[in-house]
Every structure is written in C-alpha cells, then in structure tokens.
UniProtKB/Swiss-Prot annotation:
Alphabetical list of Pfam families matching this protein: RRF
Entry-linked InterPro entries: Ribosome_recyc_fac, Ribosome_recyc_fac_dom, RRF_sf
Main location, first listed in the record: cytoplasm
GO cellular component: cytoplasm
One annotated GO molecular function: ribosomal large subunit binding
Keywords: Cytoplasm, Protein biosynthesis
Swiss-Prot/TrEMBL GO biological process terms: translational termination
Name of the protein this chain belongs to: Ribosome-recycling factor
Gene that specifies this protein: frr
Places the protein is found: Cytoplasm
Entry function: Responsible for the release of ribosomes from messenger RNA at the termination of protein biosynthesis. May increase the efficiency of translation by recycling ribosomes from one round of translation to another.
Length: 184
C-alpha cells in the first residue's frame, strides 16, 4: 500500500509540472511588445491541402527586438503566409519585399497591457485550479489506501508541500510575466 502512495506522489509531481509547462507555453504566446517567434506557433499555412505550422515552412528570426522576419523556404508561400497571419488573432499586418515578411510589433498601449495582465492572471488562476484538482484527486487516492493514520498524514502532508511549492512557482512566473508586460 505504501508503494501505491509513493507512486501517487510521483504522479502528482509529474501532473503539476505539466500544468505549469502548459501555463508557461501559453505565456510565451502573449504579446509583450518584444518580438518573440513563439507568438507564431498557432499560425498554420495551407500547404498542398494540409494545414502546416509556419515554423516548418520558413525560418523565423528576431530583428531589432521589435520585429520578426519570416523567410519562407519557398517564395511562392509568401501570399499564403501573409493571408494566414492576417487571419490569425495577432493583430499585426505583415510587410513583404518579395523575399521576406516582416512583422513589426508596436509597444502595447497601457490599455492593452492591462488586458494582457488580466489574461496572464486568468491563465495562472486556471493553472492553480488544475493544481488544486490534482491535489484533491491525490488526497482521495491516499485516503482510499489502507494506510495507518500516521502514514496517511505523512503522505497528505507531502501532497500539500508539493501543492504549496507549485502554487508559489505559478505566482512567481505570473508576476514575472506581468512585470515584463508593464515594463514599458
């Protein structure tokens, strides 16, 4: 029975870590005013009838900190890439010179930054809820095992320590992202 409890601890560590990774991935896609190639992760191009990620069809680089340059491996893709970027919810109009596409990222207005801060807070709160749900499920599993009261209390305490550690990490990452957004 104790082995099952230890397996439960390892499993929740993994699940909580995965929840944080998802949050951090989502944070990368939030526009801060600095050019970040990760913002294009959700942009797909219609390439020979199938939706293909932009990053597999072109090289993407940062120029001057506030500009992304997209160089397609095939020049014939430029109109399709431009169309896909315009159709996305990025709110940026690409400029092209026939070889490259350029995306200029203006600094967000104060109003837009406040909206982005709320989005960061929403994502961090969703992650906290996920971590709490993981904790609840783990506590239920531990309580169903036929452990002594002392062992049960020990494992429940370990679960709470892991939860607290993850909550602090979520708060720290959300605060860092908010500081980055409000830096301008």
């Amino acid at each position: 029975m104790e082995q099952k409890a230890q397996e439960t601890i390892l499993l929740i560590e993994k699940k909580m870590s995965q929840a944080q990774e998802v949050m951090l991935k989502n944070f990368l896609e939030i526009r801060t005013g600095y050019a970040n190639p990760n913002i294009l992760n959700k942009v797909n191009i219609n390439y020979y009838g199938s939706q293909t990620p932009l990053k597999t069809l072109s090289s993407i680089s940062v120029s001057e900190g506030t500009q992304l340059q997209i160089k397609p491996y095939e020049k014939t893709l430029i109109p399709s890439i431009k169309k896909a970027i315009l159709a996305s919810d990025l709110g940026i109009t690409p400029e092209t010179d026939g070889v490259l596409l350029r995306l200029n990222f203006p600094k967000p207005t104060e109003e837009r930054r406040k909206v982005l801060v709320k989005e960061v807070d929403k994502l961090s709160e969703q992650t906290k809820v996920a971590v709490r749900n993981i904790r609840r499920d783990a506590n239920d599993k531990i309580k169903k095992l036929a452990l002594t009261k002392d062992l049960e209390a020990l494992y429940l305490e370990k679960i709470q320590i892991l939860t607290d550690k993850n909550m602090k990490m979520i708060e720290k990452e959300a605060n860092n992202k908010n500081k980055e957004l409000l830096k301008f």
